[in-house]
């Protein structure tokens, strides 16, 4: 299993190829490729590369799926024994990012399903021949 820890939006996130993650808003359009260079750790088949603070030669590539707004967060402030109350709320802007690959020193790690995918071989025998063979 391959994973990396990246830093984006002031947060550290553990990411794996082939999965999507909700992160802080990125200034890109949907279906656009994004390369994240701030990689703190890469793990592949038991070999761990830890950066000080960043891993040199490591990048994480992904595709922006969509932008949306998160759930409303209510902030309520109150001072006891006083008549001071404030109720405010906000919605965070979020980007959904699909992680395509993790690269370490030129070696590219992709999701296991993507590496094994091949074009399916279609049987090109006409349907009439199949029916006559069945009789």
Curated annotation (Swiss-Prot):
Q: Which residues form the signal peptide?
A: none
What does the UniProt keyword field contain? Answer: Ribonucleoprotein, Ribosomal protein, RNA-binding, rRNA-binding
Q: Which PROSITE patterns match?
A: RIBOSOMAL_L21
Query: InterPro entries from the entry?
Result: bL21-like, bL21-like_sf, Ribosomal_bL21, Ribosomal_bL21_CS
Cellular compartments per GO CC: cytoplasm; ribonucleoprotein complex; ribosome
**Listed GO MF terms:** rRNA binding; structural constituent of ribosome
Q: Where is this region: Disordered?
A: 114-135
Record GO biological process: translation
Q: Where is the composition biased (Acidic residues)?
A: 125-135
Query: Where on the tree of life does the source sit, at the highest rank?
Result: Bacteria
Pfam families, alphabetized? Ribosomal_L21p (PF00829)
Family under the similarity heading: Belongs to the bacterial ribosomal protein bL21 family.
Q: PANTHER family under this entry?
A: 50S RIBOSOMAL PROTEIN L21, LARGE RIBOSOMAL SUBUNIT PROTEIN BL21M
Q: What does this protein do?
A: This protein binds to 23S rRNA in the presence of protein L20.
Q: Which NCBIfam families match?
A: L21
Q: How does it assemble?
A: Part of the 50S ribosomal subunit. Contacts protein L20.
The identity of this protein, by name, is: Large ribosomal subunit protein bL21
What organism does the UniProt record list as the source? Nostoc punctiforme (strain ATCC 29133 / PCC 73102)
The opening ranks of the lineage are: Bacteria, Bacillati, Cyanobacteriota, Cyanophyceae, Nostocales
> What gene name does this entry carry?
rplU
């Amino acid at each position: 299993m391959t994973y990396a820890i990246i830093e984006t939006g002031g947060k550290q996130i553990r990411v794996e190829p082939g999965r999507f993650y909700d992160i802080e808003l990125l200034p890109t359009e949907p279906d656009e490729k994004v390369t994240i260079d701030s990689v703190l750790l890469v793990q592949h088949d038991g070999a761990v590369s830890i950066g000080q603070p960043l891993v040199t030669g490591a990048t994480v590539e992904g595709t922006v799926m969509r932008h949306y707004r998160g759930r409303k967060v209510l902030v309520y402030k109150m001072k006891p024994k006083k008549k001071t109350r404030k109720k405010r709320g906000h919605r965070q802007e979020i980007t959904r990012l699909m992680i395509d690959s993790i690269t370490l020193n030129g070696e590219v790690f992709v999701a296991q399903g993507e590496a094994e995918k091949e074009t399916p071989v279609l049987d090109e025998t006409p349907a009439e021949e199949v029916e006559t063979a069945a009789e």
